[in-house]
Amino acid sequence: MKKLIALLLVLGGLLALVACGFPVQYKDGGDGGKDETPVVQPDNGYTLGSTDVVQLNGFRSIDIEWISGSVTVELYDGEGIELKEALADGGAVSVPMEWRVDEDDSTLDVCSQPKLLSVSEEKHLTVKLPRSMVLHELDVETVSAAVSVDLTDEDTLTLNELDITSVSGTVYVNAANAGEISLSTTSGAISGSVRTQNLEADSVSGSVELTLDVLPTELDMETSSGPVTLTLPAGDTAPSLFVEFRTTSGQFASDVPVTHMKDAPWELQTVSGSVTIALAQ
């Protein structure tokens, strides 16, 4: 369970960043009063607030760090990248997000708020990517924010790596077409459909329920108590899988023939969580 331990350490670091920020300062309302609008300054090199289009030429990756609320990534007909944020309750955002273009790393960095603020708001972030975009990596890290990545429209986006990590937020992916996909959570559920040759999913107590549009060449899944359900694509003949399944008290069930062997291309490890491999109807 080394990967699960590493996951907990990473997620603990995210929580520490939230807890260790500076107290937020507020504007002087005059006449001894206090304006409840916080004074927010961006980190060095960052810009505050939503932006209609970020023009990116030859960009390598997008890194998103979000605390609470939700993150939605989808495709659209534009030529740049749209970043929009809004409060969950529809109110005005008082602690805006910040973003920057890192020319050295060819990366777009997006944060839910300046890193040294201790206050946070439950906000929805919508990221729209051009359908024709070529991107090496999309990396999303959240604390309690739910993550939804929907790349269904014509599957024209070229993406090499998709990496999503959350503490308690749910993770949903739809037709995520990438060379490598990694999905990690502590207590949030992981669900959706994926198309990849290399799939990794890690959970402690959250469930994992994924439909595989194609059979990955390599698959690695670890859970503690969360159940795992993998639905394979339907075909004229059922595939025969080579699987290494390690567990303490978990159960394994499969609708297709499985050969259990050490160091198999598909590795499934649980403590008490069940694993089910089903065939799409």
Q: Language-model features: where?
A:
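C-terminal motif of bacterial Sec signal peptides marking the signal peptidase cleavage site
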Residues: A16-A19
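Repetitive helical segments and hydrophobic/amphipathic motifs
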Residues: L11-G12
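Repetitive beta-strand solenoid architecture
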Residues: G58, I67, D77, E121-K123, ...
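Secondary-structure transition/turn motif
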Residues: L87-D89, V110-K123
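Polar/charged low-complexity regions in secreted precursors and cytosolic/nuclear IDRs
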Residues: D63-E65, L117, D139-E141, A145, ...
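Short linear S-[DN]-x-LW-Φ motif typified by the pepsin-like aspartic protease active-site region
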Residues: F22-D105, H124-H136, A146-E161, P265-E267, ...
